[in-house]
Amino acid sequence: MAMYGGQIHLIIGPMFAGKSTELIRLVKRYQIARYKCLVVNYEKDARYGNGVRTHDNTCISAVPTASLDDVESISEHVEVIGIDEGQFFPNIVSFCERMANAGKVLIVAALDGTFQRKPFTNICELIPLAENVTKLNAVCMYCYKDASFSKRLGNETEIEIIGGSDKYKSVCRKCYFF
């Protein structure tokens, strides 16, 4: 089935905002419309096995990889590419631009900021290339207001620490500083 043109749809926000849920929802819509879809997830995120799984247990099968270069040949045979945990792929900008220019639809779910509220640079670079950017909020796990930030519970300083509610909380601006 021929696509009407390539595009990049970026879904950003803190942890527990529903980014993976939205990614799965959009990919399933394309599947219902009989588009060939590929979903990719970050290889080091082995919390849920082979697949993208939301915190409420919704799942879609996915190809695990550490580098988007590894799925480029598979990508030639699909029309829609979903990428979860996009912030962990260093070459996501060049990959998405190349694939969108080849007529493919890219749906990328990613954190926009680190636990230190610093930007994931590669995701920020993707924003001006995207046709659609959706910024989701979570619920603050302390005061239950809108949460725009991810707060790490441990004292680790490295950026890439894979985890769920055991390691992170979604928080509002006020509760970030508690």
From Swiss-Prot:
Positions annotated as active site in the UniProt record: 85
Assigned EC number: 2.7.1.21
UniProt-listed Gene3D superfamilies: 3.30.60.20, P-loop containing nucleotide triphosphate hydrolases
Top-level taxon of origin: Viruses
Pfam families, per database record: TK
GO BP annotations listed: DNA biosynthetic process; thymidine metabolic process
Top-tier EC class: transferase
GO molecular function, one term: thymidine kinase activity
Matching PROSITE patterns: TK_CELLULAR_TYPE (PS00603)
The name this protein goes by in its record: Thymidine kinase
Catalytic activity: thymidine + ATP = dTMP + ADP + H(+)
Sites where the protein binds Zn(2+): 140, 143, 172, 175
Family in the record: Belongs to the thymidine kinase family.
Binding site for ATP: 13-20
Transmembrane segments: none
Residues binding substrate, per UniProt: 115, 159-163
UniProtKB keywords: ATP-binding, DNA synthesis, Kinase, Metal-binding, Nucleotide-binding, Transferase, Zinc
